Amino acid sequence: PFKKLFKLMDVIFPKSKIEDFIPKDVILNSEKIEHYINGETDHNALMSLAKNLLNKYASAKLVITSRIHCAIPCLSLGTPVLFILKGLRDENQHMSRFRGILDHMNILTLQNKQELNTLFGKKMNCYHPDEIDWENPPKNPSTFKKYAEILKKKCTMYINQ
């Protein structure tokens, strides 16, 4: 089923803008966060930046992102996250980043849900912007929790060795 995904960039994002997905009032009342960091930033400053980002994610009402490194912490913190799938151009460059991850996220898209389900070969957690109650965003799927528990156990066992 993943061989069809190289076409998703044109299917999901046919020259769209953020305003196509998110109401203007939500954008105006939001904080935009960039993750670009100077390559010369020292370790202590990086740790401080990471802590500040995690605090922002934890206290957010909703996070809308196209970045996995933002979405995954939001899932673990219980912060509602809507993942905008973009940048997927071909199997070799991008699919390895998405395999097994998108099953556990809510995807914000303009695409018809059934078409996306067909492209992915399974039911995905997809939302059209018109379906979202922006004051009460959808809760994250809980399917990732069983994997989180397995990882916690493995990490604890490793640390205790």
Regions found by a protein language model. Give the residues of each.
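Active-site anion-handling motifs in enzyme catalytic cores
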Residues: 1-161
